């Protein structure tokens, strides 16, 4: 039906007759000549219809936006002064010699001249995807997956599929359950990740595995979360953490160079403890120059209890963010930041403006100066390397509150004041705690199959609170691109971890018996990592949501406006599955 794509026509085609198919992007009637902007996946080309061919001209005149058409015409150079350098095809135009309307279009429910609501865009996704910005992102995504496959297969990785219907296992989020018709009362679960299957593949001797795979999590959604998402999943045997990090860092560096012509350079490594201390986050955005600086030791003896209390508390923290040029902040801005840190449990936000660093207390402006004295103020200024024109923002509370509140404030101030430096800042975060503790119960910070760093099973059981995991996260511009770890390959160690997590031997046998069995039969050391493909493509394309780099995403309520999923199953289907529904309607609150 066609000889070329619209967007591929250029000066080398001048003098050739081409046949193109696509959609009418725009129709213009200028002085008796009709111009059609014809669009397909590869771009837009201008087609000109002359009134000399009356019947053809009338057909062209009847075209409207999004009519699907086939055209035939002669490629020619645009007249002098009409070259459009903003178009890839802007040097040429096509003189129309033929025109077939393949299908007409109703009036569009989306308006190309304004921002449409996301609900409308998702309801008519097939129209939304016709927009060049959207189709370009999907094309970019396809090239990313192709480059990933090429890189990994060139390094000896095998693309192996794992089951979509599996068993429910505790991985941190709720499972999507699928009822079994043949096993009454039993359910499959859609996989939250291929974690256990890829470990079993390593125990099978597959050595290097990868898969670009759908994963499913029934969790509360945010801008960067979807109920179904895609992972670049990787696992290896007989390689340690550093080797896995080297392979996967090489893959991402290769990808950025190939797709964006960006050299990311070698990724620095930072411990979890350093990341939290300096940036208040385990995924720090290193484009932001602001840091949290500890000053508790300087403030232990001040009369100001707001500072001295946490400074003398083993679980407290007093830290400062120095904002270059921030002395020009208004009181209103400071009050807004005070309200902001309150979201994270902070009781207030002390501040100090440095108007003149050489003028002692006279050069400082702050309601807390009277509690500090000149010597303490000098020490604080020296510690944070303050300059004239800066403002210091203080956090004083429990270490958890200060770290979280100032970490969030650092990001907000950096964005508000446009302080970000450079376009891309990757790093590895390593040495995570093995467990988190809440109310005396331990929880795996990553997942329960992560190996501890340099500990025997006995040492781990004796001191789980201080155990570090052999885990590593790749972070780019404050987003976690991927996370991985060395896995447990010893049955005794795995049993100890289950025990620490409060999983009884009976529960472990029911949920993970197959894994514990596999660990008996010469399971090799293995390690891996998984990247979020959607998030990676979002960052690389500059999209603001992963929904904008997925063909058919769900809404933030995990619904599909296009197909109206999830839907209601028929009574016959439910009966076949031995399922009875009992939906309790919430009572409306009574008016009092």
Curated annotation (Swiss-Prot):
Q: What is this protein's name? A: Aspartate--tRNA(Asp/Asn) ligase
- CDD domains named in the record: AspRS_core, EcAspRS_like_N
The Swiss-Prot or TrEMBL record describes its family as follows:
Belongs to the class-II aminoacyl-tRNA synthetase family. Type 1 subfamily.
Biological process GO terms, please? aspartyl-tRNA aminoacylation
Keyword Protein biosynthesis (UniProt) = yes
Question: Which PROSITE patterns does the record match to this protein?
Answer: AA_TRNA_LIGASE_II (PS50862)
The primary site where this protein sits is: cytoplasm
Site Important for tRNA non-discrimination: which residues?
81
Single GO cellular component annotation? cytoplasm
User: What Pfam families is this protein classified in?
Assistant: GAD, tRNA-synt_2, tRNA_anti-codon
Q: Which Gene3D superfamilies match?
A: Bira Bifunctional Protein, Domain 2 (3.30.930.10), GAD-like domain (3.30.1360.30), Nucleic acid-binding proteins (2.40.50.140)
Question: What organism is the protein native to?
Answer: Pseudoalteromonas atlantica (strain T6c / ATCC BAA-1087)
Q: Which InterPro entries match?
A: Aa-tRNA-synt_II, aa-tRNA-synth_II, aa-tRNA-synth_II/BPL/LPL, Asp-tRNA-ligase_1, Asp-tRNA-ligase_1_N, Asp/Asn-tRNA-synth_IIb, AspRS_core, GAD-like_sf
- Region Aspartate: which residues? 195-198
Gene, per the UniProt record:
aspS
Where is it localised?
Answer: Cytoplasm
> GO MF terms on file?
aspartate-tRNA ligase activity; aspartate-tRNA(Asn) ligase activity; ATP binding; nucleic acid binding
């Amino acid at each position: 039906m066609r000889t070329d794509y619209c967007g591929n026509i250029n000066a080398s085609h001048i003098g050739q007759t081409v046949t193109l198919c696509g959609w009418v992007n725009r129709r213009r009637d200028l002085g008796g000549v009709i111009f059609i902007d014809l669009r397909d996946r590869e771009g837009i080309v201008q087609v000109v219809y002359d009134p000399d061919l009356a019947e053809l001209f009338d057909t062209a005149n009847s075209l409207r936006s999004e009519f699907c058409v086939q055209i035939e015409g002669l490629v020619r150079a645009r007249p002098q002064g009409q070259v459009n350098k903003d178009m890839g095809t802007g040097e040429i135009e096509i003189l129309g010699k033929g025109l077939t309307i393949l299908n007409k279009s109703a009036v569009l429910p989306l308006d190309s001249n304004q921002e449409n609501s996301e609900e409308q865009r998702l309801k008519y996704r097939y129209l939304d995807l016709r927009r060049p910005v959207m189709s370009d992102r999907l094309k970019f995504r396809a090239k990313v997956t192709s480059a990933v496959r090429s890189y990994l297969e060139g390094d000896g990785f095998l693309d192996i599929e794992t089951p979509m219907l599996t068993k429910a296992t505790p991985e941190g989020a709720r499972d999507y359950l699928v009822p079994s018709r043949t096993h009454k009362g039993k359910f499959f679960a859609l996989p939250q990740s291929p974690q256990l299957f890829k470990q079993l593949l390593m125990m099978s001797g597959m050595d290097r595995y990868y898969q670009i795979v759908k994963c499913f999590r029934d969790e509360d959604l945010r801008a960067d979360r979807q109920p179904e998402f895609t992972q670049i999943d990787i696992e290896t045997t007989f390689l340690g953490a550093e080797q896995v990090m080297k392979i996967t860092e090489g893959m991402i560096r290769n990808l950025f160079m190939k797709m964006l012509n960006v050299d990311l350079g070698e990724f620095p490594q930072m411990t979890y403890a350093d990341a939290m201390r300096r940036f208040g986050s385990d995924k720090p955005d290193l484009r932001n120059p602001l840091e949290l600086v500890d000053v508790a030791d300087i403030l232990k003896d001040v009369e100001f209890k707001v500072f001295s209390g946490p400074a003398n508390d083993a679980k407290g923290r007093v830290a400062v963010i120095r904002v270059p040029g921030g002395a020009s902040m208004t009181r209103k801005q400071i009050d807004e930041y005070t309200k902001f840190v309150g979201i994270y449990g902070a009781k207030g936000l002390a501040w100090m403006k440095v108007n003149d660093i050489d003028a002692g207390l006279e050069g400082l402006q702050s309601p807390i100066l009277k509690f500090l004295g000149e010597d303490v103020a000098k020490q604080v200024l020296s510690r944070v390397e303050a300059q004239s024109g800066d403002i210091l923002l203080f956090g004083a509370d429990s270490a958890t509150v200060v770290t979280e509140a100032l970490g969030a404030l650092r990001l907000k101030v950096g964005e508000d004041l446009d302080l970000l430096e450079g376009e891309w800042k990757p790093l590895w975060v390593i040495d995570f705690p093995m467990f988190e503790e809440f109310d005396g119960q331990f929880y795996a910070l990553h997942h329960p199959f992560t190996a501890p760093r340099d500990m025997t099973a006995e040492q781990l059981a004796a001191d789980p609170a201080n155990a570090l995991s052999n885990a590593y996260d790749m972070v780019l511009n404050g987003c976690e691109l991927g996370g991985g770890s060395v896995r447990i390959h010893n049955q005794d160690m795995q049993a100890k971890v289950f025990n620490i997590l409060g999983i009884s031997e009976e529960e472990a046998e029911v949920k993970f018996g197959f894994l514990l069995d596999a660990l008996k039969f010469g399971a090799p050391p293995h390690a891996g990592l998984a990247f979020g493909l959607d998030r990676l493509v979002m960052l690389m394309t500059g999209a603001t949501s992963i929904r904008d780099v997925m063909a058919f995403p769900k809404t933030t309520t995990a619904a599909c406006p296009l197909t109206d999923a999830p839907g209601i199953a028929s009574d016959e289907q439910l009966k076949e599955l031995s399922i009875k529904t009992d939906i309790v309607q919430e009572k409306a609150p009574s008016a009092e």
